[in-house]
Amino acid sequence: MGKNRKSKRQLVRDEKRAKKRGLEIEHEEERDIKKQRREEEAHQDAFAPVTDAGYVPPPLDGTYDENAFPGGPEEGRRNGPNTNFEREFFGMLAEQEQEYFRHADELLELNDFPSTEERDIFLQNVYKELRGKELKVASSQSCSRLMERLILLSNTRQKKSLFDAFGGHFISLVTHRFASHCCEKLFLQSAPVVTQELSGEYEQEPLPEGEEETEAMKSSMEDLFLLTLDELEEHLGYLLTDRFGSHAIRALLVILSGRPLDQAGTKSMLQSRKKEYITVEGAAANQSELSSQIRAVPSSFTMAIKKIIDDSTMTMDATALRVLAKHPTGNPTLQLLLELELTMFVKGKEKKEKNKQKKDDEEAEEKKEETQSEVTLLGMLVPDAPAAFADNTTQAAEFVNSMIYDPIGSRLLETLITHCPGKIFKGLQQHIFGPRIQSLLRNDIACYPAIKVLNRLSREDLADAVEKSLPEMASFVDKGRFNVIRTLFERCHIRNGTDEINALLKALTSAYGNDWKKLVPKLCMLDEDVVEEEQKPDPKFQTQEAKNKAFMLNHGCQLVAALLAIPGQPSKAIQASLAALKPAQVMKMATTSHNTSSILVKALQTPATNPTFHKVLVSSLLPHVYELATSQQGSAVLNEIISLPSKPAEPNAPAVPFHMKENIISQLANYESELRETWLGRNVWRTWKGDMWSHRRHDWVRWAKETDPETARVAAIPRKREEKEKEEAEKKPKGYLGKNFDPKKLKGFAAKKFEKKEAEA
């Protein structure tokens, strides 16, 4: 047989295709560079013209160009327009270099190396090839992902070498579309090293043969971060509103503050929802534990944060701050600056002042004058607070009122309400939020700052807010403000407001026809057609109506879960509603979405107000065991059942009868081959120990009863009658003569002995 060889025509065609593909990649990079330059030029042209006369006032209609320099036209006059630096172009990689780095990226993405030593050797070879081309690779569309993966797998010495390569070019890199992601990754991955060096736990890696040690490798990571900040310092005003640079500034602020890097709130602050998640298989195991906890940072980092806040706000006036507060890019950075100032400096000063004893009245007055003379970001946003909140014409009151209903500015207001000192919060509550709390809770934007206010209210103020909100309960339900209702219930439970909880439950039930059974079907939308999570389209292609329905379902399920966690009437109402559901509705809850299935899991974990509650809930699921086992949401409900005991340890404690567990495992055994074909089915089969059931059933029974109380695990062993009587006699108190003892029936010696004992007693 002849060998399958390509013809000459096919080889020529493949060569043409490869050249065409290479040209397309080059053209794509050129187009991206030209597009970025056009955007920069357009951004520069957006600046308001500034004359030598000084400040250019905003238009009379109250509008302001959000693309203007965040420091206002005065800063533009002093520092020049936003382009007070020249964006560098680092050149393009050759075709062979691109091919090499692309292949290295594929190998690193799989991370399928025989051992860590071979991977380290491969990384060293890549770094040798990368030497002198770091800036080109970081700013390349096709190879910047390689740089991010290299940073994930690099040791401390290699990270310091990248700081050395990027040094002097950070302002161009952090504002670049692709290189900015590499800088963020380098900052975040290097943050734990600062704490390790500070505590003395860091050990220097050995220098590879043939490599010279640079000055950056000898320097500490703290010094490298401070040098980076020095380089970015003069451009902070521009970076606050830059599309890419603002993310790098936020990352640096989080690192300097020592906050955890892996928390969900931190990640949402640092990156947008559209950001591509670059990772390496198995790289998560190499990450330091310091990323998920509060880190110790040197004092120089705290001073750097203070300097960044001062430099960022020094050249701004009230108008520029309002523009920045409503700027979609500048607002998150301003939130972080305000939060750091309030948590690290304002509250720290208050604690110190309380702990220190004032020696003289004169010294106390001098301290007050000094603190009043200091210009802070909080003081610029709400000057003369809290006294200024009493007058609606003051700058502080106007700022708060203008931000309440703004979709972007309200987020800054949430940060202010959450972290501001108690005196300022009392002024906000007394003059702005308290009198109209019920109308603010009705609004789809203002309800979020109002919820933050509810979280800080005292017992008396919360009772007043609940009293004002009770007549609006029907409106809350119609508009889908379930997050507002949930917050009211949770805060009343924390503040031990039993009367308020009962009043809220009564108002909520009346909005649904005074019937507890309607709560879960209405709040979880069981009567409406809801698309399952597996069949949902991409969020980009969802209609606004579908998105609103998803949000309402999410908030409704959160409300049900909150009511279920509150003992007393709220938990009783939700359990009664769950017990009244039809089997089809329970099955829909278990398989439709994670929000609804989590309610069933929590219901199985909650103590029952009705002894048959858990039994009724599980019996509704018994006919659909296979469907639950192969469902992503239903499998979690099924796995929760086996973790519950068969007999309750205490009255009304969660329990599922053992015969129901046997019924479920026998049904799973009938579908064993089908379950083994899917990952979810294998997970359920493993959790229920199906192999043990098939081969060693008596061991499975013993294992299934391990969750039962100690005395209820096995049946009692038959014993002799004499042993039983002996045990019963030992349990009886001394001198016990039985229930039916009658001393009048005693005769002779027994009667005399009883009389003697009675006389002695």
UniProtKB/Swiss-Prot annotation:
Pumilio repeat start and end residues: 129-164, 165-200, 231-271, 395-430, 432-467, 620-666
One Pfam family linked to the record: PUF_NOP9
GO molecular function: RNA binding
Keyword Methyltransferase carried by entry: no
Location in or out of the cell: Nucleus, Nucleolus
A single BP term in Gene Ontology: endonucleolytic cleavage to generate mature 5'-end of SSU-rRNA from (SSU-rRNA, 5.8S rRNA, LSU-rRNA)
Keywords of this entry: Nucleus, Repeat, Ribosome biogenesis, rRNA processing
Region (Disordered): 1-56, 350-372, 712-739
Membrane-spanning residues: none
Basic and acidic residues compositional bias, start-end: 11-44, 350-371, 719-733
InterPro entries registered for this protein in UniProt: ARM-like, ARM-type_fold, NOP9, Pumilio_RNA-bd_rpt
Amino acid composition bias (Basic residues), ranges on this chain: 1-10
Cross-referenced SMART domains: Pumilio
GO cellular component assignments: 90S preribosome; nucleolus; preribosome, small subunit precursor
Domain of life: Eukaryota
Record-linked PANTHER family: NUCLEOLAR PROTEIN 9
Function: RNA-binding nucleolar protein required for pre-rRNA processing. Involved in production of 18S rRNA and assembly of small ribosomal subunit.
Similarity comment: Belongs to the NOP9 family.
Stated name of the protein: Nucleolar protein 9
Organism field: Sordaria macrospora (strain ATCC MYA-333 / DSM 997 / K(L3346) / K-hell)
